A protein has these predicted regions:
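Boundary/linker segments of alpha-helical solenoid repeat arrays
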Residues: 1, 33-41, 80-88, 125-129, ...
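"A position-specific structural signal for the A-helix of alpha-solenoid helical repeats
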Residues: 4-8, 48-51, 55, 62, ...
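TPR/TPR-like (Sel1-like) alpha-helical repeat modules
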Residues: 26-31, 74-78, 138-162
Length: 172
């Protein structure tokens, strides 16, 4: 639980353009990872390590080191892809592969971003946010048919829900 708090704060600070504010929380994540490793808890130490990797990648991005950030984020996503979810825990709030896709999209690489979002959906199906990102990436890469398919899936997933998202209404 502590790790999730530090991760959320670090990621939020880095993505808000305040990398210095993220660094103490990443230090705390590394400290927690080491304690878990010392306690021989390989699963949770690995999960916390991935969180630290993700947040560190976003710090690099916030510092304008985009190539390094993309490499670091790709490595974090690969590490998360190799782990299995613990049977008694919920999935991660936002998969590393999805965050990698967001970084790719932000870096002007919509085709690569789309591939990352599609990989996320294979492992973590029916994620509304991932569908939204995939639709945007498809649109930006010029694949309007695929974008429309994704927007239609979003509308179907949210059928009957109060629709306040203008992006979804614009494509339905």
């Amino acid at each position: 639980v502590q790790a999730m708090t530090y991760f959320a704060r670090a990621l939020g600070a880095a993505r808000s353009g305040n990398p210095e504010a993220a660094k103490p929380d990443i230090a705390k994540l590394n400290e927690l990872r080491d304690k878990l490793r010392d306690a021989k808890d390989a699963y949770w130490s690995g999960q916390v390590d991935i969180q630290a990797q993700v947040a560190s990648a976003w710090i690099l991005s916030a510092e304008g080191k985009q190539d390094e950030a993309l490499k670091a984020m790709s490595a974090a996503a690969d590490a998360e892809d190799k782990t299995e979810k613990h049977p008694v825990t919920p999935g991660v709030p936002k998969p590393a592969r999805e965050l990698y896709g967001e970084m790719l999209l932000q870096s002007g690489m919509p085709g690569e971003a789309l591939a990352a979002f599609e990989a996320t959906l294979k492992k973590e199906p029916n994620r509304l946010g991932t569908y939204m990102c995939a639709a945007k990436a498809a649109e930006k890469s010029g694949d309007n048919a695929k974008a429309r398919d994704y927007y239609e899936k979003i509308v179907a997933m949210t059928d009957g829900a109060y629709q306040t998202r203008t992006a979804m209404r614009a494509h339905s």
